[in-house]
Amino acid sequence: MTDFSPREIVSELDRFIVGQADAKRAVAIALRNRWRRLQLEGSLREEVLPKNILMIGPTGVGKTEIARRLAKLAGAPFLKVEATKFTEVGYVGRDVEQIIRDLVEVAIAQVREKKRKDVQARAQVAAEERVLDALVGPGSGPATRDSFRKKLRAGELNDKEIEIETQAGSGSPMFEIPGMPGAQIGAVSLGDIFGKMGGRTKKRRLTVADSHEILVNEEADKLLDTDQLVQEAIAAVENNGIVFLDEIDKICVRDGRSGGEVSREGVQRDLLPLIEGTTVSTKHGAVKTEHILFIASGAFHIAKPSDLLPELQGRLPIRVELNALSRDDMRRILTEPEASLIKQYVALMKTEGVTLDFSDDAIDALADVAVAVNSTVENIGARRLQTVMERVLDEISFVAPDRHGETFRVDADYVKTNVGDLAKNTDLSRFIL
């Protein structure tokens, strides 16, 4: 768990996301509160529950992007799921407890990666010995091995093909246990029940360079204590886990509607104990969910937050509204973030030896077109910029391989020539932009 201050978290999010200060502050405080709770002693630590967040705002304003960037910052088990993917228990499909099972798998992968680094040096030595066995045979003399070891470390043997034995992948037969639908426990693998069946291996022919990472990871895994790894992962989920529930407005039951709404309300009811705190059984052990932070988000352009079950509303106490994007926001999105759209396209064209030069008035024109189409057709926020950029740079992208060494200047006239008429014609915009 990282110990960034809320100010540091917000400034980190500012590098990639324009505006939405309220949402950034809310997630920054929530993340810091996770760290604060872990500093408490004894029974008080158990009593401090996370304040779950509901982010409300139109599509394309940064809700999902905030969650994505937060995941990288948190250094904690993080899972993003769409609420629409789940069904009520008893219906065909995945039930909400699968969220926690998936989160545990994420945590195990995270902890394993971290622990591999701790045993990296020993794993490198063991992997090197296996490569030497493949090159000169296990019974070769010390002088021969030393000679090949020097060549191996110098990179002279990187392109040489060797045959190595590696762990077979998870190709175990899968089946469902009668009376326990796969939706509830996930498909059961015979490998999970009978272990790895004596550690099945298969022979593969690879270059020395390609085999290096595979062998180092295998040797590192042999040095790890799997039981301890799983226990650490479960503890990380229980104390630091974060779940981002997207599209929560799509499971709202709207007044005067019936039919499929039953299942939607059922999903909300199933989410209640998960968010409030329950114990979920996974194949790795029981997981308590009391201290997992849930961040729900939705556009709520048809439904309202008040259409959620009252109990679910109560379990999402912090409300944050994200604002629709203005023309100025669109302009900033094109230029300010570290991986802004313009920087991406300039870098892509550079691979062809072509220089792209955007004038200030071109950036203004791109923002104007995006705002105009959003206001007349359908407001999809910043995602509209991608459509407009692709349309504007269509010709340049097509001819770039034949124009090596040339410079293309994109100005306001160039933008208007390519998309200006489409933006004005609402009927065409509907289909093209």
Swiss-Prot record:
InterPro entries attached to this UniProt entry: AAA+_ATPase, ATP-dep_Clp_protease_ClpX, ATPase_AAA_core, Clp_ATPase_C, HslU, P-loop_NTPase
GO biological process: protein unfolding; proteolysis involved in protein catabolic process
Binding site for ATP: V18, G60, V61, G62, K63, T64, E65, D246, E311, R383
Primary localization: cytoplasm
Subcellular location field: Cytoplasm
GO CC annotations, alphabetized: HslUV protease complex
MF (Gene Ontology): ATP binding; ATP hydrolysis activity; peptidase activity; proteasome-activating activity
UniProtKB keywords: ATP-binding, Chaperone, Cytoplasm, Nucleotide-binding
HAMAP family associated with the record: HslU (MF_00249)
Record family assignment: Belongs to the ClpX chaperone family. HslU subfamily.
Physiological role: ATPase subunit of a proteasome-like degradation complex; this subunit has chaperone activity. The binding of ATP and its subsequent hydrolysis by HslU are essential for unfolding of protein substrates subsequently hydrolyzed by HslV. HslU recognizes the N-terminal part of its protein substrates and unfolds these before they are guided to HslV for hydrolysis.
Assembly and binders: A double ring-shaped homohexamer of HslV is capped on each side by a ring-shaped HslU homohexamer. The assembly of the HslU/HslV complex is dependent on binding of ATP.
The protein's name in its UniProt record: ATP-dependent protease ATPase subunit HslU
Organism expressing this protein natively: Rhodopseudomonas palustris (strain ATCC BAA-98 / CGA009)
Gene giving rise to this polypeptide: hslU
